[in-house]
């Protein structure tokens, strides 16, 4: 049985220092829990190295800026922390999750005085899809929920609030026997899966949807 994510061994980088996994907690009245005010990244680790770490950190800082948040650490500090947590937890192949969120200093839509917290966790996480399903080909349902227009929210960010439609779509697809759901954008164009990018190769070139779809 897989251990719950709140009950594991290891360390989490939490606001500038390492804490035991079980001690990395936040208050129930944190703004992020009520209003979705958090941004994050998902970074794969192969043989103790993070794939495209620079690009991930740049996108994280961009997402935070677009969501009116200032992460209190520099790009280099974040990169160093992401690299160090691999060795701190003795992970060879895994997944790194940096996340920034608004704290509990204010409750309400306005949150300009909230503290921006920052944490980095790492764990061993195999392929997003079952290996047998990958060999057969992933079965996707077309979701009835669409990615929002860029005029409604900064949808070129990796913001937590944007993932609610992905959760709804994934649940619905799984209940129908599909592995995942294909998300379309507000114009009906192919966007992504619920938690994975979609691309195809044509004439030796990689084609993938634009970030604002």
What are these regions (language model features)?
Residues 1-73, 77-84, 109-213:
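Helix-start/capping segments and mature chain N-termini
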């Amino acid at each position: 049985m897989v251990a719950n994510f709140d009950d594991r061994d290891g360390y989490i980088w939490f606001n500038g220092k390492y804490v035991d996994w079980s001690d990395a907690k936040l208050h129930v009245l944190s703004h992020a829990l009520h209003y979705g005010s958090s941004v994050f990244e998902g970074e794969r680790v192969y043989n103790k190295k993070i794939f495209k770490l620079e690009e991930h950190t740049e996108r994280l800082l961009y997402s935070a800026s677009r969501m009116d948040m200032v992460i209190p650490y520099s790009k280099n500090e974040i990169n160093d922390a992401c690299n160090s947590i691999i060795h701190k937890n003795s992970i060879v192949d895994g997944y790194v999750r940096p996340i920034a969120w608004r704290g509990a200093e204010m409750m309400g839509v306005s949150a300009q005085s909230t503290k921006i917290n920052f944490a980095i966790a790492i764990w061993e996480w195999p392929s997003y899809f079952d290996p047998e399903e990958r060999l057969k080909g992933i079965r996707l349902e077309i979701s009835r929920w669409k990615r929002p227009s860029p005029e409604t929210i900064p949808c070129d960010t990796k913001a937590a609030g944007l993932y609610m439609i992905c959760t709804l779509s994934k649940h619905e697809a799984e209940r129908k026997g599909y592995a995942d759901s294909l998300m379309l954008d507000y114009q009906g164009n192919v966007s992504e899966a619920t938690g994975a990018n979609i691309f195809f190769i044509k004439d030796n070139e990689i084609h993938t949807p634009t970030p604002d779809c």
